[in-house]
Regions:
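Bacterial N-terminal signal peptides that target proteins for export
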Residues: 3-23
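N-terminal secretory/targeting leader peptides
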Residues: 23-26, 38-127, 139-338
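Intrinsically disordered, low-complexity peptide-like regions
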Residues: 1-2, 12, 64, 114
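Active-site-adjacent segment of FAD-dependent monooxygenases/related oxidoreductases
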Residues: 130
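Sec/Tat signal peptide C-region and signal peptidase I cleavage site
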Residues: 31-37
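Alpha-helical transmembrane segments and their juxtamembrane interfaces
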Residues: 14, 29-30, 53
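Divalent-metal coordination cores built from histidine and acidic residues
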Residues: 134, 138
C-alpha cells in the first residue's frame, strides 16, 4: 500500500470517528436538554402569614417537593397575605394567576360556596377518602374552582369564641364579633353583630374596640399577637379548622405522571401527619393561653350542648342555603350518624 493510500484511509477513519463523536455529543446534549426542559416550576401562595401555624404545614410540603422533585418539579413560594389578600386566593387559583394555594374554605366561598362545608366534618380525612366524601367534593372543586383538592393539612383543630367581655350564657346580643364565613351564621344566630375582616386587621380592630371578640381555632392566636388583646375563651369548641393544598386543574392536567407523583407523595405525608400534629398543638396552645392570662368561660352541661348543637344546625343550614344542589349530600358524607 502506498503512503498516500494509507494516509487517505487513516484520514477517512478519523473523519468517521469525528462524525460519530459529534453525533454522540449532539444526542447527549439533546437528552440533557430534554431532561432539563421537563422540570417545571409552580407558583404558590398561602392565605396565611408565612411561618405561622396555618402556613407551616404547607411550607413543609413545599420543602418536601423541592427536595424530592429536583430535576422534575419545583415550587416557587411567593408568600402569604402580603403577596396576595386571603379572599383573593381562590379566584387567583381558578384563573391560573397562581398554580398552588394553601387556603381554607372560608376564604374561597366567593368562588365555591361549598368549600366552607369542610369546617363541619365530623369524620377524619382518611374516612372521607373512603366513604365518597372526598371524591364528591373533589368533583365540585374541579367544576367550580378549576382546582384539584390535593390534601388537607389542618384537621382535628376546633374553633372557639374569644372575647374581651364576659358572658354567662350562649347569647352574644350587643356584642360586635369579627367573623369569616366560618362563623357568620352561628354568631348571628346567637345575636351578635358581625364584622368581616382579614386576619391581618383583627389586632387593630380589638385594640380600637371595633370588635369585642372573634372566632378562631384553639391554635394560632400567638402567631398574630391577638393574645395581647384577648381576655376570655369560650368553651366548648365547635367545628374544626381546615386548611388545604389546592392545585390549579389546568396546570395539573399538564403535569407528567412523575411530577404528579412528587406532589402526591408530599401531600399524602402532610395529610397523614395533620391529626396527630394538631392534637399536640391544641394541648400546647390551651396551656399557653392560660399562662398568658386568658380566662376560660365554661357553660353548664345543658348550655354547652345547646351551644354546639346550634353551631352545627346553623352551619349546615347556611351550607344548604348557599348550595341547594350539593349541601344535603355533603352533609351525608361529613356528619356522623346521631
Amino acid at each position: 500500500m502506498t503512503n498516500d493510500r494509507a494516509f487517505e484511509l487513516g484520514r477517512g477513519r478519523i473523519v468517521t470517528m469525528c462524525k460519530k463523536l459529534a453525533l454522540g455529543l449532539a444526542a447527549a446534549t439533546l437528552i440533557c436538554s430534554s431532561a432539563l426542559a421537563q422540570e417545571v416550576t409552580l407558583r404558590a401562595v398561602s392565605a396565611f402569614a408565612e411561618k405561622t401555624t396555618y402556613s407551616r404545614g404547607f411550607e413543609k410540603f413545599i420543602d418536601r417537593v423541592n427536595a424530592d422533585g429536583k430535576g422534575v418539579i419545583q415550587i416557587n413560594y411567593i408568600g402569604g397575605p402580603k403577596a396576595m389578600p386571603p379572599f383573593e386566593v381562590g379566584n387567583a387559583l381558578k384563573t391560573g394567576v397562581v398554580d398552588i394555594a394553601n387556603t381554607t374554605g372560608a376564604f374561597t366561598t366567593n368562588v365555591m360556596p361549598e368549600s366552607d362545608a369542610w369546617k363541619l366534618t365530623e369524620r377524619p380525612m382518611s374516612e372521607l377518602r373512603k366513604n365518597g366524601g372526598y371524591d364528591y367534593m373533589a368533583t365540585i372543586y374541579a367544576q367550580k374552582m378549576n382546582a384539584i383538592f390535593l390534601a388537607r393539612l389542618v384537621d382535628n383543630n376546633p374553633f372557639h369564641l374569644y372575647l374581651n367581655k364576659p358572658i354567662t350564657a350562649p347569647d352574644l346580643t350587643g356584642l360586635k364579633i369579627r367573623i369569616t364565613p366560618v362563623y357568620r351564621d352561628f354568631f348571628q344566630a346567637l345575636g351578635a353583630t358581625v364584622v368581616q375582616t382579614p386576619p391581618g386587621e383583627v389586632y387593630t380592630s380589638l385594640e380600637r374596640g371595633v370588635v369585642d371578640g372573634y372566632g378562631w381555632p384553639i391554635t394560632g392566636i400567638f402567631d398574630l399577637g391577638w393574645h395581647e388583646k384577648t381576655k376570655y375563651r369560650v368553651d366548648p369548641g365547635f367545628y374544626t379548622a381546615e386548611v388545604s393544598v389546592l392545585v390549579n386543574k389546568t396546570t395539573w392536567d399538564k403535569l407528567s405522571a412523575a411530577q404528579k407523583a412528587v406532589l402526591n407523595k408530599a401531600a399524602q405525608l402532610g395529610e397523614s401527619e395533620a391529626t396527630a400534629e394538631f392534637s399536640a398543638e391544641n394541648a400546647k396552645d390551651t396551656k399557653r393561653q392560660a399562662d398568658a392570662g386568658i380566662q376560660t368561660i365554661k357553660f353548664d352541661a345543658a348550655a354547652a350542648e345547646s351551644f354546639r348543637t346550634k353551631a352545627y344546625q346553623t352551619g349546615w343550614e347556611g351550607i344548604i342555603k348557599q348550595s341547594p344542589e350539593h349541601g344535603a349530600k355533603i352533609r351525608e358524607f361529613f356528619s356522623k350518624a346521631k
